[in-house]
From Swiss-Prot:
Pfam families in the cross-refs: PH
Quaternary structure annotation from Swiss-Prot or TrEMBL: Identified in a complex containing FRS2, GRB2, GAB1, PIK3R1 and SOS1. Forms a tripartite complex containing GAB1, METTL13 and SPRY2. Within the complex interacts with METTL13. Interacts with GRB2 and with other SH2-containing proteins. Interacts with phosphorylated LAT2. Interacts with PTPRJ. Interacts (phosphorylated) with PTPN11. Interacts with HCK.
The encoding gene: GAB1
Residues modified as Phosphotyrosine: Y627, Y659
Annotated protein name in UniProt: GRB2-associated-binding protein 1
Naturally occurring in which organism (per UniProt): Mesocricetus auratus
Length: 694
């Protein structure tokens, strides 16, 4: 024991180190507070395993203490209603739990007396005491309102400066009745006056006390909203339940939703409330603005209804340009067809004296058959009619006048000499394209109908049948996907379609689209999945359970740094590490501190006397002695690394006999040495095998 005077002693529960707050238990220890003012010894706080132990587990130097906090809280079930205080030192914070509040206050007072600590300035107890007295005095501030109203309103409406100043009752009543009079009288008006009187007073009588109260409130908002309420509902007593008048936006929105007729001055509007009536005009203007806008919109909507719907690009050109007589009749008939083909129209005035057989006899070029992939229209030939003679034009357009068959799905003809009846209209138009190609244009120009610059072709795309034929080429190639074109019935390559230089090349299908989905090998039956790797965190566990924190009743004590400077760390304080409490797992953490191990000469001093054969002080010395024996006694014939492996156990030595030269005497000596140390025998029993090794 130290030689200081015992100031205080008792049982306290001590916390483990901060990094072990969650993993280790808070153990009950016997604490002794010693003062060395009379004896010259340092002021220390010692704790023992029990009250009759002779050697302390640890000595806390109070000269290194920085602060003491009392009344902490800890979010743990066993410490919910405990009395916790801490001793904050340079090395560590000790959290101590007392059995009662008196016991805690006694320990804190004694420690503060020895250390010379004073309460800190940021003590939260004083503001709590002042604030707790304020609501008690505030109900006596004003007695103009009922008791229930005053108790509810005074903590909110009174400024905080009046709560802090303690004045006599009568001057306090007079002083507080001037400034917050607006709010108090407004509440009184709500509670005292009945609904009919209140309604009539606000709309007709300007001399009543209630109206005078409203004059103090922003009156340019309240009368306008109340007037509109009166015009709609006939009473507005429920609106006055608000503490402050509603905003203009709220009143306008309510009026516009309920108001049907323009406002007038038929209500009893007072001359005093002229700003309110002025604002009513402003609200009338605001209200009429949406109605005017809606009337304009209604007119525009009426115009848009009478006006036809804007036509689609296919319906833009309803009357083609200068066409022959047959062309005009045929194109005007086709232009009126909507997007979905209607029933077959009546026969035109031109006679259909052409049969499908005559169509097959018309001369064709090699690329003529490729034109079957384009839907012919009446608008395509006129753009090229300047290159055709008059006789051929009349003949060919008589053939084109019989183009009225869109009901049969078109298929690719297997033979050039025979075609279906549904192809007779296409074949006749192909004759036009064939004659046009003779006039100096290439055979690949048969795909010129895909040019989007031709207006009749844009129109013709509006009544085509892209659903019935997948190989259909639209007249606007900008929106057509050539990757899917010709996948079902591809055109022959010898007809020149694929080799056409002006036809966009077919985009190859991406390989990623054809790949199968990835295989989930975890779905195989009887598959042994690898276990997920364990997430080993360094030391985050102590962060999950926070240390005891400050509470509203926490009191902090610290010394004045100007009057009591911190003394340097003494070297003789931490010399009591070893004790009879060797099984205390939390205290085994203390010698791992580098400062303690370097300053304590008796910790490992006995090991160096006998060359590692002294009595065991800590079980940590096993590895040190074992590695010293292996390093110093490694034979010359074998490297030290293999000698270590051979000495790790009998099984390892037996395995390496086949290919490593092993000294049997050294192997047995190392084996017996290891068994002696692991069994916890005395050093005298292990001296014989150790010397035999040497």
């Amino acid at each position: 024991m130290s030689g200081g005077e015992v100031v205080c002693s008792g049982w306290l529960r001590k916390s483990p180190p901060e990094k072990k707050l969650k993993r280790y238990a808070w153990k009950r220890r016997w604490f002794v507070l010693r003062s060395g003012r009379l004896t010259g010894d340092p002021d220390v706080l010692e704790y023992y395993k029990n009250d009759h132990a002779k050697k302390p587990i640890r000595i806390i130097d109070l000269n290194l203490c920085q602060q003491v906090d009392a009344g902490l809280t800890f979010n743990k079930k066993e410490f919910e209603n405990s009395y916790i205080f801490d001793i904050n030192t340079i090395d560590r914070i000790f959290y101590l739990v007392a059995d009662s509040e008196e016991d805690m206050n006694k320990w804190v007072r004694c420690i503060c007396d020895i250390c010379g600590f004073n309460p800190t300035e940021e003590d939260p107890v004083k503001p709590l005491g002042n604030s707790s007295q304020a609501p008690v005095d505030s109900p006596f501030a004003g007695n103009t309102a009922p008791a229930s109203t005053q108790l509810e309103a005074s903590p909110v409406t009174l400024p905080p400066s009046y709560q802090l100043i303690s004045l006599p009752p009568h001057p306090d009543t007079l002083g507080l009745q001037d400034d917050p009079q607006d709010y108090l009288l407004l509440i009184n008006c709500q509670s005292k006056k009945p609904e009919p009187t209140r309604t009539h007073a606000d709309s007709a009588k300007p001399t009543s006390s209630e109206t005078d109260c409203n004059d103090n409130v922003p009156s340019h908002k309240t009368p306008a909203s109340s007037q509109s309420k009166h015009g709609v509902n006939g009473f507005f007593q429920q609106q006055m339940l608000y503490d402050c008048p509603p905003s203009r936006a709220a009143s306008v929105s309510v009026d516009s939703s309920l108001y049907n007729l323009p406002r007038s001055y038929s209500h009893d509007v007072l001359p005093k409330e002229s700003p309110s009536s002025t604002e009513a005009d402003g609200q009338l203007y605001i209200f009429n603005t949406p109605s005017g806008t809606s009337s304009v919109e209604a007119q525009m909507r009426h115009v848009s209804i009478s006006y036809d719907i804007p036509p689609t690009p296919g319906n833009t050109y309803q009357i083609p340009r200068t066409f022959p007589e047959g062309t005009l009749g045929q194109s005007s008939k086709l232009d009126t067809i909507p997007d979905i083909p209607p029933p077959r129209p009546p026969k035109p005035h031109l006679t259909h004296d052409r049969s499908p057989v005559e169509t097959c006899g018309a001369p064709r070029t090699a690329s003529d058959t490729d034109s079957s992939y384009c839907v012919p229209t009446a608008g395509m030939p006129p753009s090229r009619s300047n290159t055709i003679s008059t006789v051929d034009l009349n003949k060919l357009w008589k053939d084109a006048s019989s183009q009225d068959c869109y009901d049969i799905p078109r298929t690719f003809p297997s033979d050039r000499s025979s075609s279906l009846e549904g192809f007779h209209n296409q074949s006749k138009i192909k004759n036009v394209l064939t004659v046009a190609s003779v006039s100096g244009e290439e055979p690949d120009e048969n795909y010129v109908p895909m040019n989007p610059n031709s207006p009749p072709r844009q129109h013709s795309s509006s009544f085509t049948e892209p659903i019935q034929e997948p190989n259909y080429v639209p007249m606007t190639p900008g929106t057509f996907d050539f990757s899917s074109f010709g996948m079902q019935v591809p055109p022959p390559a010898h007809l020149g379609f694929r080799s056409s230089p002006k036809t966009p090349p077919r985009r190859p299908v991406p390989v990623a689209d054809c790949e199968p989905p990835p295989v989930d090998r975890n779905l195989k039956p009887d598959r042994k999945a690898k276990p997920a790797p364990l997430e080993i965190k360094p030391l985050p566990e102590w962060e999950e359970l926070q240390a005891p924190v400050r509470s509203p009743i926490t009191r902090s004590f610290a010394r004045d740094s100007s009057r009591f400077p911190l003394s340097p760390r003494p070297n003789s304080v931490h010399s009591t590490t070893s004790s009879s409490d060797s099984h205390d797992s939390e205290e085994n953490y203390v010698p791992m501190n580098p400062n303690l191990s370097s300053e304590d000469p008796n910790l490992f001093g006995s090991n160096s006397l006998d060359g590692g054969s002294s009595s065991m002080i800590k079980p940590k010395g096993d590895k040190q002695v074992e590695y010293l024996d292996l390093d110093l006694d490694s034979g010359k014939s074998t490297p030290p690394r293999k000698q270590k492996n051979s000495g790790s156990g009998s099984s390892m030595a037996d395995e390496r006999v086949d290919y490593v030269v092993v000294d049997q005497q050294k192997t047995l000596a190392l084996k017996s040495t290891r068994e002696a140390w692991t069994d916890g025998r005395q050093s005298t029993e292990s001296e014989t095998p150790t010397k035999s090794v040497k």
